[in-house]
Amino acid sequence: MVNVAPTLLCVHAHPDDEALFTAGISSHYGDLGYRVVLITCTNGQLGLDDHGRPGSDPLHNVEVTRATRAAELQRAAIVAGFSRVVTLGYDDSGMRGWPQNDSPDAFMNADVGCVARTLAAVMDEVDVSVVVTYDENGFYGHPDHVTANVVTRAAMELAASPKRLYYPIAPKAVLEEFVAGAKAKGVFLPAWILEADHGVSDDTVSTTMDVRAFAKRKHQAIATHVSQVDNADLVTMDEELFTLLFGIEYYQLAWSRDVTSGDETDLFGGL
């Protein structure tokens, strides 16, 4: 009988989320020989365009942004250790309150059952053991992140192979220390950090992944999404600050098929 490598699946909303939130674990498990798969739900066409204009700007170039972000995603995924990338192609919904929220093609308006069936099919095809996506608040409230949680939870009920579901989270103490240090050094902080509701309590953390050995790779993955200049200061800030935020990844166990839990330093522990 041939032993098949365990599979990690990360479900993300936009191109660059895979670099910002989970590039540490994807690099770690990829280097261990695990199969690491990425599903990106939207094309990110409302991100910053080639002139740095957000999707809310009437002059924003949607077509250029869509193509640019697709290319950046493929390059960054390789850096971050993903062996396969699945893109669902839904439109970016934009931040809450943007007019694009009303588009029938926006991910937040997608049919949950339809998306869940697509995700479940991928989960079982790759025989996934561990799935990672955002918590119910989408980490910082973005509609597409919230929708990613909803459809992933629905897919877990349909798929036979997943054994665990984790959420990437930021402990309150870590986030506050980072934000204070960044502000003291004049670092521009993007919305996904400033609007993360001040982090979560320490007792929410079930698994702590020390990925400092992959900090440079995570830095490179973030930098690969060069069009998203709102993250530029994260790329240029000093190593100490970068490692404080990105050197340790924290996860909350949201669901487990078996009552047996893993250890506190391995998402696959005990499987």
Feature annotation, model-predicted:
Residues 1-9, 100-101, 105, 109-271:
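Metal-dependent de-N-acetylase/amidase catalytic core
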Residues 1-126, 154, 158, 242, ...:
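Active-site rim/loop-helix segments in enzyme catalytic domains that contact anionic ligands
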